[in-house]
């Protein structure tokens, strides 16, 4: 049972395309869902510092995976960014 319709649409597309749950796209997708869930949780519970730390860790993992994908395959990276509606990280 999926609570969020956005999650179900993207996960169905991922399942139709490939069964590989270890792919970079699927990992970024699952991290994005965790980030959105933790963000809404932290909106209610502002002093939950362990969840804040967990959110920062997941954000870092997603950032590293996106950097890897942008180096390896820029087309798949752009498509994933557009599909998940997340911003590109700032370049230094």
Curated annotation (Swiss-Prot):
Organism of derivation: Lemna minor
TM region positions: none
Taxonomic placement: Eukaryota, Viridiplantae, Streptophyta, Embryophyta, Tracheophyta
Main location: plastid
SUPFAM superfamilies: S15/NS1 RNA-binding domain
Complex formation: Part of the 30S ribosomal subunit.
SMART domains to which the protein is assigned, alphabetical: Ribosomal_S15
The protein's name in its UniProt record: Small ribosomal subunit protein uS15c
GO MF annotations in UniProt: structural constituent of ribosome
Encoding gene per record: rps15-A
Family the UniProt entry places it in: Belongs to the universal ribosomal protein uS15 family.
GO cellular component entries: chloroplast; ribonucleoprotein complex; ribosome
Alphabetized PROSITE patterns for the sequence: RIBOSOMAL_S15
Annotated GO biological process: translation
Keywords (A to Z) from UniProt: Chloroplast, Plastid, Ribonucleoprotein, Ribosomal protein
Cellular compartments annotated: Plastid, Chloroplast
């Amino acid at each position: 049972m999926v609570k969020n319709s956005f999650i179900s649409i993207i996960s169905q597309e991922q399942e139709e395309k490939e069964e590989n749950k270890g792919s970079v796209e699927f990992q970024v997708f699952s991290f994005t869902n965790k980030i959105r869930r933790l963000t809404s949780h932290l909106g209610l519970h502002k002093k939950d510092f362990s969840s804040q730390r967990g959110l920062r860790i997941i954000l870092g993992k997603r950032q590293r995976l996106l950097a890897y994908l942008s180096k390896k395959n820029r087309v798949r990276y752009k498509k994933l960014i557009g599909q998940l509606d997340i911003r590109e990280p700032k370049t230094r």
